[in-house]
Amino acid sequence: RDGNQALIDPMDPERKLRMFKTLVRMGFKEIEVGFPSASQPDFDFVRHIIEHDLIPDDVTIQVLVQSRPELIRRTYESIRGAKQAIVHFYNSVNPLQRRVVFGLDQAGVTKIAVDAATLCRSLEPTVAGTRVRYEYSPESFTLAEPEFAVAICEAVMDVIEPTPTN
């Protein structure tokens, strides 16, 4: 997650805004601004910086989301109106979580990732005017079979169709 939820004293919106503005002043061009589907404050923060035109033209915001359809849809609602955004989606891929959490094999977990990528692509028209890029993370991949970690990323790339500039 963006780490804010793990803090003993999570940042309030004003503090997050100070942090965002500081990162912009420092010259960062890609800034993760939250996990808008995980909490209303994160959603509201993303909407605030978009609606108040606080994102410089040369800065891309990034939002984090689990590979779950309802959360992906909510995330796209949050970025509507941004000039550019990176949607960073993820799902766990290690054998223990595949078995215990999802009750799925490699094919089933790959389907979660591919379905998420497909949904993301299908939602692009809902944020017309926003240049959307993607980041996919196979969460806990270091505990997964290396061949599987590579294969699931390749399956996602087949949907996302990355280019050198996107």
Enumerate the language-model features and the residues they cover:
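Alpha/beta enzyme core
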Residues: D2, A6-I31, V46-P56, P69-N166
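Acidic/polar N-terminal loop/beta-strand segments that form early-domain functional surfaces
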Residues: V33-A38, L64-Q66, Y90
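Conserved glycine-rich "GG(E/T)P / GGGxP" loop and the immediately following alpha-helix
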Residues: S37-P41, T142-A144
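A glycine-rich helix N-cap at a beta->alpha junction
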Residues: I55-V63
